[in-house]
Amino acid sequence: IYDLKALKKSPKKLTMTNPANAEEAKACVEAGIDLFVLGNKEIEPFREVAPTHFMGAASIFAQFGSKSEIIDDAFDKMRRGADMYYTLRSFDVMESLVNEGIPVQSHIGLIPTFSHYCGGLRGWGRSSEEAMKIFETIKRMEDIGVTAVEAECIAEEVLDSINLKTSVVTFSLGSGSSGDVIMSFVADICGQDSEEDKPPKHAHAFGNVGKLIKKVHKERVSALSAFNSEVKKNNFPYPETNISMHPGEKEKFMSKLDKWTPVHQ
């Protein structure tokens, strides 16, 4: 947490992404990614492959009804290896978590969970009025002790203008390069979307994992189809895949088999 806050006075940028499983986490570690956000996942498998990485964990918005349940969940995740707790709940809940000594991350700008009554999935802060609302929100979070925010799809001029006016660490997701940490999703970075999908504006594919996954799937279907076909034609198992008795043992076995009688009648 101390190192994150020190980014405000440094030109250094850190990277953050959201591995979905231990395999993706291992790839992130090997690639040098600095920070993980795990969401509402089990933490232990990620800690096995990334024991020293900074990891944020979360509860989904409607997972718990009461403040006490949220606090209990936050403590549980911290015990299991989380370094910070993400929540979209009220300022009161955030402040209560802070008062318990839990580093809190929240969210400003586009919040997909609430997009259905905020004009859909769109850019935020494109008007001066909305930009001021974003600034006032992050300052309110600062006042209650929030450590960090995900700044999603905010006009780059806005984050550039407010980032040094707050002590809250900013994780920029589609909000320009002024964030203290630059975040993107593993699926977007690796190009896991299919050609038919329309990725969000802020997404940039640095790889072609989606095409490779499709190729692997096609190859898997081809192999399974060939197996199914060969069995149905009575061609498989092939002679070279079978096990044979030692020379002369079949004759002995057949002789014993012919002479066999039940022990119990």
Language-model segments: what does each one mean?
Residues I1-Q265:
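Alpha/beta enzyme core
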